[in-house]
Structures are given as structure tokens and as C-alpha cells.
Amino acid sequence: LSATPGLILAAPSSGSGKTTIALGLMRALARRGVRVAAAKAGPDYIDPGFHRVATGRACLNLDPWAMQAQTRAGLASELGCDADLIVCEGVMGLFDGIDAAGTGSSATLAAETGWPVLLAVDAKGLAASFGPLVAGFAAADPAVRIAGAIANRTGGTRHVELLRQALARRCPDMQFLGGIGRDQALALPERHLGLVPAGETPDLERVVERAADACTAALDLDAILRLARPTRLGAAPPARLLAPLGQHIAVASDAAFAFAYPAQLAAWRRQGAEVSFFSPLADQKPAVGADAVFLPGGYPELHVGKIASASCFVAALRAFAGFVYGECGGYMVLGDGLVDADGTRHAMLGLLPVETTFAKRKLHLGYRKVRLRADLPFGRAGMSFRGHEFHYSAILAENRPERLFDPCDAAGHTLESCGARRGNVAGSYIHLIDQDGP
């Protein structure tokens, strides 16, 4: 067993304030000298950026559906290195997964790791009902231990005391860890894919500090530390995730291309690849000597004019002789053109015969299992991978591309073949996470 104890901060539903509480708790404990390692359940790219600000170290995703069990075990071991406590923020509601049984949920991760759950409840409009609500969650799955409850957006000391009493009546053995008051100054700005990324959030350090002040004043931090438990996951080798795209991988990294998993970049380095970074928005070229380019997802639709006019970047990618791979936003930039929210078309790299549009917004969301249709640097034809899709843009036109993947959704329903490949260039809307397990 890993000696480093951990906790999962979860909630009954999205929008309960768990990200803000997670940031405040991480920073409040760090102030006390606790070396906090942050994790995020599920595939989200944005929350880990906030966690990094709060803790000063990279946050790792632990995905109960898209990662193999040995991958999660390896990442949990990595989290425990040089840390006193692992705090994992859950995803959506505690039991929300890919189906009615909650497969792939934060509860799945809690049962697998043995980490106790702190349930953060939006208590605005609740009093005596707080007790039955928490009791219902606590009784839902004997493999998931809800060790304590936090009330968020409380209305004052009398309200907090009512909530404490309500929990004691229904769950006498569960700890009430405190009530955090309503504070609009703790709100984090949002956009179409969720929270505005950490690097673009003004005054983020002030918000984290204010959240830490609120947690320090309202929560029993000593009790929270006592509730943490080591993981049940056994020792595991470092996570491999996806094979390297090349010997030297140049990764686009800026506000338009921000969605690359730190664990994947670290895994590439462990497997012997060099990883360098460049900014298309700054009109930079991939590093000299790179034999592969990775254009990750992000927000190219918000910077499309600047990308189109980045002449050095565009010329370098069009002339690049190595392997070029794009995911989601990176896939859009590899195409012939991108139509922005105002309906204006911008010429893109023209490396794949695809036109995309952000003017006709439609949500595409869900886990995907895909089978590779051709040999590529990260896999042989027929290999399967797991990942996820989350975007509002859409394919406007295609010119008979060679397809990259045969996909199905998390329930196993077959979907239309997707992505495109041409020569040394390939991409799709799907963010790959791990090889498919046995």
C-alpha cells in the first residue's frame, strides 16, 4: 500500500462549489506545511490547472473509465511521492458516471482506492433536509465511505448549527467538518467548455487565498487530516499511457492549445522522448530537431485570426516532414478552414481535408473507445484506445478523408468512423487518454 493518505472531495451534483473548496482546502493545508498532491477524477483539463496554482505542483487526472487499472495505480503512486496528503477532486455528482449504475464515477474511484469521501453540499435553501440528503449518499454504496460533510454557501452561524444538528440526527457517526459562507468573491469565471482556464483567470491568486482563508476559518482542518487514508492500490510501475509520437515531440502550448495532460508528457519523457514547447500564438516554430508535432486541444476558435496570421508557424507546419498529430482544437487547426462564431472563415494549415465551424454550435460530449485504422507512431492498426470528446464546434465539410478511428461510445454503441489522416498528418476530435485494457 502507498503510505501517503488521500481523500476525495465530492458533491451531490455539479455546481456545488467543490472546485472552490478544493482550492481553498489545498492552499489552507499547504500554509500549515502539509505537502499536498492534487488529483482530479475524470478527463477534465481545466480544474487541474487551478489545482496547480493552489499546490505549486502538477495535478494528475485519475480516470475510472478511460484509464487502465494499472495506469491509475501508477499515477496514484506518483502522486504519493514527496507528498503528505493526496486531495482528489471528484467529477460531477459523486455517483454520476456513464450509466445509471454510476460506472466510472467518483464513487468508482473511491471504492477502488479506499480514499474516504468528503461530501461538499450546497446548503443554500437547506436546513433539516441536509441530514437525510447526506445520509442517503452515505448509505448508497457500502464500498464508498463518506467520512465527513461540508456545508457550502451557508447563511450564518445559526444556519450552520442547524445543519450540524441535522447531520447528527441522521448520521451520528459522521463528522460535520464545517460550513463555508456565501461569498461572490469566490466565484470563478466560466465559458463554453467550463471554467476559464487558470492562466486566463484574473486575480486567481487572490481568489485562492480568499478560499483558503474561508476554509481555515470554517473547516476543521485537523479532523480532515485525520480522516485521510492510504490507498488500497498496490505498488505499480510508472504509467505508460500512450507511446511517444516521436523521439523529439514539439508540443504547441499557449492559450489556444492548452489541453495536454501532464502525466502524458511525463510518460513520454520516461519512455525516452524529448518534449519541447512552442507557441503558435506567438508565431513560434517547432524546435529544430523535432521529429513530431502535437497540437493539443484548447480554444483555437477564440484566437483563430491570430493563428491564421501566424506566418512562421503556418509555414513551418506545412513544411514539416515529421509526424503531426492534432486533437480537438488542434484537429481543427490542421484542417483547411475554421469558421468563427461570427461566421467568418479563416484559412488554417490545410494539412487535412476538413472544414470546421464554431458558428453552428452543438455540444458533443462523451467517452469514446476507438480502434486505430492504420499504423501510426503511437500504435499499430487494430489497436484500441480510450478517450473523450468535448466540443461545441462541428464538421462543416470534408473532402473524402482517410478515416483515423472506428469509435464506439462508453456503452459500446458503434459510432461513425471519425478523424482524418493524410500522409504524415493525423487528427480527430477525440482526446486520447490511455490504451484500452484487457
Language-model features, listed with the residues they occupy:
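ATP-dependent carboxylate-amine ligase catalytic core
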Residues: 2-113, 117, 121-145, 157-161
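Phosphate-binding active sites in nucleotide-utilizing proteins
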Residues: 247-308, 314-319
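A short helix->loop->beta-strand "cap" motif at the edges of active sites that frequently abuts
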Residues: 115, 172-174, 319-323
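C-terminal and late-domain segments of enzyme folds
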Residues: 110, 243-245, 258-269, 274-275, ...
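Structural motif
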Residues: 8, 87-89, 118-120, 150, ...
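Cysteine-nucleophile active-site neighborhood
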Residues: 300-376
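Internal gly/pro-rich beta-alpha loop/helix module
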Residues: 127-241
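Residues that mark the start of a beta-strand
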Residues: 6, 33-37, 246-248, 274, ...
